Every structure is written in C-alpha cells, then in structure tokens.
C-alpha cells in the first residue's frame, strides 16, 4: 500500500503522551490537514545515548514488520520513519483486557489476522500481552506494537516455531476471556510449549531481565507492596498539617526494577516542590498537586479514577469517560498533568 505524499509529508501535531520509557516516547496526535486520520509517533530522538542502539534496533524491527504487513486488515499503517522516530496510523479499538471478547467471531478473525501475517512471513512475538490485541469498533481483531516482530525470508523451523507461539499466545487470551470456546485441539496446544520457548525461559529470559531491570532500570513492574497502608498515615498527617492542603489521595504504580512506587495526589494550590519539602522520609516517588480531587456523591475521593491515572491506564480512563461523561471536567486536567508515563502494570 502506497502512502500519498501529502500524508507522508504532513506535519505531526501531538496531542497525548501515552508512554515514556528508556527506549522511546509514544505520542498520539493527528496530521496537519488530515483531521480524520489519527496517528501515533514512536519518538526516538530523545533516547539517552546508552540506550540508543537497542532503541533503534527495536525501531528497525518495527519498521520492517510494519512494511511487511501493509494492507493486512487489522495491522497499523506505517506512514514514515526518520531520525525523529516512526509514525504510524492509530488503530481504533479496545484493548483485550477491557474488551474481554466472549464471541467466537473475534477469535476467528484474530486467527485470520495471524494467518495473513504468516503468509507475509511475519511473526509478532509479543502478543502474549493483551494490550497488544484490540477489538475494533466493528468487532474485528487488530494488533499493535511490532517492536519485537520478525520478518522471515524463509519458512524454516524457526519461522514455524515462532508462528506457532503467536497462535498459542492467542489461545491463551481465549482461555482467559472465553475458555468455553476452546476446542480439544486448542487445549492440547496450550499444554505444550515449544522447545525454543522453554529454552528462552530457562536461559535467555534471565539475561534479558538482568539487562533491562538492573542495568537499564526498566521492567514490567512485577511484585506489589502495600505502601499506602505502611507509609500513608505518616505522609497524610504531615501534609494535612499545612493549612493550604485540603485532602490527600494515595495510589501505587509499578516502578522500573524497584517494586512499587507511591503516587500522591494532593488537593492544594501549593507547588510540587513545596509538597516534597513537607513530606516525611521516605517521600512518595511522585507528588501531583491538583486543584480539586474527583469525588463521589458522598464527598470521598474517586480512588478508582486516581489509580488509573497513577498507572497511566488511558484506555480504561477513556472507557470510564464514555460511561461517565460528567467526569470529564474533573479528571481531564489531572490526566494532562499526570507524572507516570510508563506502561508498566502492577501484578500481585
């Protein structure tokens, strides 16, 4: 599929930062002159020098993968790639952990998508994550995030193994959200992990974890601690002693390679530096001053909303705003000023 010159050369207008980690920054927006074409930029020009080789290695894999799947229904469209980063179409849809499809039609379409990718010689290699699967507004399947994708020149054993693992990971999603739809054949496939996958878990994954979590201070945020219960009372007492602070709400979020961080939303007109000076040791990792906390009818803070902001869960927030549109005026300023821009997820 060829991109028209007026689209490929159009100026990117940023709107929302979705994620920022050591390897890239993900920003959604639009193209100037094309308001009906939402796009997303994986921005690479701000990556620190020591992470640049890996960041561009991942970017080149994504570029090759996106070029190979052009024209496949459910795959993003690569618009351009340059020293700034790579720009692709924004795929409208709901992440699988929210959509939780129970209809056989979605899984049938997801298999169709993997089959067409396989014909193009592409394996995704990262669809174990439910957030990389989408249910589009018309109920179709879509995939995003091709950073780990492989484009295979031949259909040898490695290709067949990786394609099988893609399918097996789709079946794991099916087992999570629609277990009654699994066939006996699919259940047998789920019970047998390929030998290369077992070798990866035993050898390469520990090395990968050491590099990313220890050397590069980056992780998937595994493990939780109840820091709110342990440190919250002293923090709340110290902050609430100030006459310009009217309330404090505490949430947790996943720290890179360090467990769990404490995120404090403080209802005040003080600046963040002033709040940090008031906090006892150990202080919360993030302190966000807010003009007004979102509240329930009884006046208590909406901790469900604040937890989604603290963990940068924009998809869930968008779904919440659709079901509760009156929340918009209260939480949009908080979302715009949020301090955690990673996509790590707390796991108990």
Stretches with model-predicted labels:
Residues 136-218:
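C-lobe/activation-segment region of protein kinase-like
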Residues 249-254, 263, 277-348:
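Conserved C-terminal "lid"/linker of ANL adenylate-forming enzymes
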Residues 11-67:
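ATP-binding glycine-rich loop module of kinase domains
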Residues 226-248, 282:
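Core catalytic subdomain of AMP-forming adenylate-forming
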Residues 55-59, 64-109:
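Conserved structural core of kinase catalytic domains
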Residues 119-134:
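Catalytic-loop of the protein kinase fold
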Residues 1-17, 200-201, 208-225:
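Juxta-kinase regulatory segment immediately upstream of eukaryotic protein kinase catalytic domains
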Residues 238-257, 263-267:
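C-terminal boundary motif of the adenylate-forming
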């Amino acid at each position: 599929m060829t991109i028209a010159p007026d689209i490929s050369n159009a100026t990117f207008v940023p709107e929302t930062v979705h994620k920022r980690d050591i390897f890239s920054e993900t920003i959604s927006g639009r193209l100037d002159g094309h308001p009906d074409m939402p796009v997303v930029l994986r921005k690479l020009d701000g990556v620190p020098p020591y992470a640049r080789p890996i960041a561009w290695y991942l970017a080149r894999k994504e570029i090759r993968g996106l070029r190979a799947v052009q024209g496949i229904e459910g795959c993003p469209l690569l618009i351009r790639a340059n020293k700034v980063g790579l720009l692709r179409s924004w795929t409208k849809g709901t992440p699988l952990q929210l959509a939780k499809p129970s209809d056989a039609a979605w899984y049938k379409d997801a298999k169709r998508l993997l089959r067409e990718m396989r014909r193009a010689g592409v394996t995704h290699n990262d669809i174990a994550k439910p957030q990389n699967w989408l249910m589009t507004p018309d109920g179709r399947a879509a995939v995003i995030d091709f950073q780990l994708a492989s484009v295979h020149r031949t259909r040898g054993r490695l290709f067949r193994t990786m394609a099988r693992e893609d399918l097996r990971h789709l079946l794991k999603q099916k087992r999570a959200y629609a277990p009654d739809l699994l066939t006996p054949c699919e259940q047998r496939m789920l019970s047998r992990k390929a030998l290369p996958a077992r070798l990866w878990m035993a050898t390469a994954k520990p090395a990968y974890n050491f590099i990313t979590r220890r050397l590069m201070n980056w992780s998937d945020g595994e493990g939780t601690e109840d820091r709110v219960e342990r440190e919250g009372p002293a923090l709340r007492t110290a902050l609430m002693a100030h006459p310009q602070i009217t309330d404090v709400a505490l949430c947790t979020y996943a720290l890179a390679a360090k467990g769990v961080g404490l995120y404090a939303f403080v209802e005040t007109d003080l600046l963040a530096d002033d709040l940090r000076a008031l906090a006892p040791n150990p202080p919360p990792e993030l302190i966000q001053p807010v003009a007004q906390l979102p509240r329930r009818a009884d006046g208590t803070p909406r901790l469900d909303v604040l937890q989604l902001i603290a963990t940068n869960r924009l998809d869930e927030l968008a779904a919440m705003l659709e079901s509760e549109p009156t929340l918009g005026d209260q939480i949009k300023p908080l979302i715009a000023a949020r301090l955690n821009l990673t996509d790590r997820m707390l796991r108990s």
